[in-house]
Design a protein with these regions (language model features):
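Surface-exposed, low-hydrophobicity beta-strand/loop segments enriched in small/polar/acidic residues
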Residues: 1-109
């Protein structure tokens, strides 16, 4: 019998509250979005699939995305409440004011 053993860890929940009306969108991440083969949940993502912490992000990545497994991710575009503390823990950085300004339909708590 063949099998593959894989270690799985849990990740922090980026959504603080699930309201039921969130606008999610699938997006293919650019190769530059990955650091060490992973793009961390909570990263602000631009329309071209790159991490964009300053200019024009269109959403927040909901879960970690692994380049080797599947370079596609899901972003929250609007009508959601995210946990800023969990984003900072996941990405290693606080959410920039420019990101909050660019995403007015997402509440950062």
């Amino acid at each position: 019998m063949k099998f593959t053993e894989k270690s799985v860890t849990t990740q922090l929940e980026i959504l603080k509250r699930k309201l039921g009306g969130e606008l999610f969108e699938e997006i293919k991440l650019d190769d530059t979005a990955f650091t060490g083969g992973v793009c961390k949940a909570g990263s602000p993502i631009a329309a071209d699939g790159k991490v964009d912490k300053e200019t024009k992000p269109i959403g927040i990545l909901i879960t970690d995305v692994y380049k080797d497994e599947n370079p596609n991710g899901t972003i929250l575009r609007a009508f959601g409440v995210v946990n800023s503390a969990n984003i900072q823990t996941s990405t290693g950085e606080a959410v920039a004011d420019a990101v909050k300004t660019a995403l007015p339909l997402i509440v950062f708590e």
